[in-house]
Amino acid sequence: MITECYIKGRFDYGVGKCAVVITEDVPKGEEKKVLHQVAWRVPESWEYNGETIVADQFNCEILAATYALQWCMKNHKQLVNIYANTTTCQKWYLRREFPESRKASAQAYIDMLEAYKKAMDEHDDTEVVDRVFVEYIKKDDKNVWNWLVNDIALNVK
């Protein structure tokens, strides 16, 4: 079971970077076990839903958050709270609401959560919900997972 998911998005000197660390739940007093850890450079801009998104601090962070949520759902069938490196963004992730000026940047994150909500609305059994959602992120060419891996060139498994 996943206990924590930390993300970091940075934009320094014209270079965007993302990092994600996901840890496993362990008994109190034991050292946390890292389940997954990845970092990557971000292109200057990218496309999602016909919108051009330019790399900046927030956009790097939302990209990391989207990846983290996707990985947790795909590999552990578990939604998680995301701990961000900025308190403003942290509030947005917890509420899952974003200011209007950031809607285009956050659309991939929002789309993924909407797909999960739709699966929950259609099925009562949590195992079925998880399976429906995981199948969605594995097979649809236009989904967020493939967009992250292919369009953003984040070649992780």
Predicted regions located by residue number:
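RNase H-like nuclease fold core
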Residues: 1-59
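Glutamate identity and glutamate-enriched acidic tracts
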Residues: 4, 24, 30-31, 44-47, ...
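Short amphipathic alpha-helical face segments that pack within enzyme cores
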Residues: 59, 63-67
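RNase H catalytic domain
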Residues: 66, 70-152
